[in-house]
């Protein structure tokens, strides 16, 4: 028993090694050879957290089913393209009217000048 206590104390100092913050990934704990040999038999992945014991090396064994990679390909059904919606650009129409009015008013004197613009568009929502 005294030998085990002596072995456990140095291992605690070994596991407190910290990695620099710039490294990526998960750091594995450093275990001595005796700690690896004292570990339990590997569990299935589903039981790994259930049977976990503190201060023990816990490993899991991959099942035959998990060891193979199965690639399943499916063909997606053809997608129908969406109908094109008419592009409504009200801001461009407003700019055209503004520039036309400005051009007409700049060429004439403001006294008695009256500008009337009438635009008629078919309702595009009725055709859909």
UniProtKB/Swiss-Prot annotation:
Stretches for region Disordered: 1-40
Record field: compositional bias (Polar residues): 12-37
Compositionally biased residues, Basic and acidic residues: 1-11
Top-level taxon of the source organism: Eukaryota
Protein name, as recorded: Uncharacterized protein C02F5.2
């Amino acid at each position: 028993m005294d030998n085990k206590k002596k072995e456990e104390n140095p291992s605690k100092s070994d596991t407190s090694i910290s990695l620099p913050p710039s490294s990526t990934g998960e750091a594995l704990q450093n275990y001595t050879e005796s700690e690896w040999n004292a570990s339990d038999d590997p569990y299935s992945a589903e039981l790994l957290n259930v049977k976990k014991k503190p201060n023990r090396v816990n490993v899991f064994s991959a099942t035959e089913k998990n060891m193979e990679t199965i690639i399943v390909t499916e063909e997606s059904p053809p997608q129908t393209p969406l109908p094109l919606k008419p592009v409504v650009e009200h801001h461009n129409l407003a700019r055209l009217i503004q520039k036309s009015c400005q051009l007409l008013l700049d060429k004439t004197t403001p006294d008695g000048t009256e500008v009337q613009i009438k635009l008629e568009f078919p309702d595009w929502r009725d055709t859909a």
